[in-house]
Amino acid sequence: PEVVVLETNCLFRSVKSKGDSKDYVLDRLSDHVEIFKNHSRWKDAFVSTNSLTKKKDEKNRGFIKRSTVKPYEGGAYMHASEERKSMDADAEKYLLLMKEYCESHGAKLVLVSSPSPKNWTYAKHNSVSDWAQANAVTYEDLNLNDALGIDWASDTKDGGDHLNFDGAKKVSAYVGNWLSEAYGLKDKRNNPDYKHWEEDSVEYASARN
């Protein structure tokens, strides 16, 4: 890939709590990103990845469609401050390894914080922003981006923890356009080699949830 996008909330969760594998983060990444699959250190650290190693033609591409609505009613949640919340030490270590590995294979690492009143704070934003600036990595915090047009009365399925299908479509459209413009990524929707993506998209959009 030309660009590898990492959602940032995982940086504040303990790596060791997930199966107690020191290579958990990179193991999981290798299940999804081809260039990471042959790194010798990651081969036998993670025992079971059944939930992630399904067939490549899986329609949802990792996202479970949910159109249910449970509004978030807590009001503004991104209050500017100088506070910092420390990243998990192991997660931060592997974040740097991912950056270096991406660069060594001609890919750029991009950090993105998804909209989530229940999970995200300005303290987390500050810590990720500090790391991104120190390591020359692009960072986009969607919690501070009004252009998304997220409506917390209708775009969340569980009171501001996760976006529902409508909210996810807004984020996908914005991030797709942003990455295309910022990195010159080509639109492959009319490329016959990627026809199955459009077919899967139609089937996925019409599926019940």
PLM feature spans:
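Flexible, glycine-rich surface segments
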Residues: 70-150
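C-terminal regions of proteins
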Residues: 126-203, 208
